Design a protein with these regions (language model features):
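Surface-exposed, charge/polar-rich loops and edge strands
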Residues: 1-170
């Protein structure tokens, strides 16, 4: 088992989070919060893509209220370990960097902190992927209820030039 840490840097700004799996039950039970309604046509489009690819190829971006101990563990790990992968996108000027946590005790500590201190996460990007996955789960009862997502502290999830909580589809 492993967790990946993920940092996106652009200019002088950056945001860092955890790439992990989330249980679709958390979405269905409202522990993964949505802030906008979805469009049936886009859900249908997402469903066709998921079925044809047999996968969701883009992770969902979730935010959570910052927990200082989680932030401290992430920062310490990054400072003490080399990244296993880094790629710069010239067109956007973004540098994407990944670290892998394989220390079982650290993974367990992070999981415990999320369980104890993060009562809900919030969808920043991926409402249609979440709603479509939920619909497919309810209709098809897949064997694996988990999907990839990126978890970022809300304080770090402000993307320049983009509102984090648009209500365009309410």
């Amino acid at each position: 088992d492993a967790l990946n840490l993920y940092r996106i840097q652009k200019g002088k700004g950056s945001y860092t989070g955890i790439v992990a799996c989330a249980d679709i039950q958390d979405y269905l039970e409202g522990k993964i919060k949505k802030h906008e309604n979805t469009l049936a046509a886009k859900e249908q489009q997402q469903m066709h893509l998921m079925i044809s690819r047999n996968a969701v190829v883009k992770p969902v971006l979730l935010t959570y209220p910052e927990v200082p101990e989680i932030t401290s563990l992430i920062i310490t790990f990054i400072e003490e370990h080399e990244a296993f992968y880094s790629v710069r996108f010239e067109k956007s000027g973004e540098l994407h960097t990944f670290w892998e946590i394989r220390d079982g005790a650290l993974i367990q500590r992070l999981e415990d902190l999320f369980r104890e201190r993060v009562s809900a996460t919030y969808i920043a990007d991926g409402h249609h992927r979440c709603s479509t996955t939920g619909l497919m789960y309810q209709r098809l009862s897949p064997q694996s209820p988990e999907g990839n997502c990126g978890l970022f502290p809300a304080a770090e999830s402000t993307i320049p030039g983009r509102k984090l909580w648009p209500n365009a589809r309410r």
